[in-house]
């Protein structure tokens, strides 16, 4: 679990809680649904760094339930990236995102997966959403 970052529609439903976005992101450091361990200042710094990468640092203190579905998805994506996983499993990662955000997130995924020892498994109904880092794909 420690080496895996994961986003799915099921995870999205599990997080329909009234927690600040920063806590949801920080829960990715502990592989938990919800935050049960108070993060250290350097961990909060890492969370904020990743929120900046995704352009959502202004949402840090907003509660998840007050965010749009696209903003919620971005928070969950940041949660998946925050621990620098070796394996990213992204199930419909672009669901709820507008075209501009899809392109931004696809570029982030590409940059991340070009780093050494990174693997991406992604599920999508739309082949045009596949990042360029994808080397193998299966159409069903």
Region locations from a protein language model:
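Conserved catalytic motifs of ABC-family nucleotide-binding domains
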Residues: 84
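Conserved ABC ATPase "signature" region
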Residues: 26, 41-59
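Q-loop/switch helix immediately C-terminal to the Walker
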Residues: 17-34
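Helix N-cap at the start of a conserved alpha-helix in ABC-type nucleotide-binding domains
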Residues: 99-101
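Conserved ABC ATPase signature
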Residues: 63-67, 71
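Catalytic Walker B motif of ABC-type/P-loop ATPase nucleotide-binding domains
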Residues: 88-92
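Hydrophobic anchor residue at the start of the ABC signature
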Residues: 77
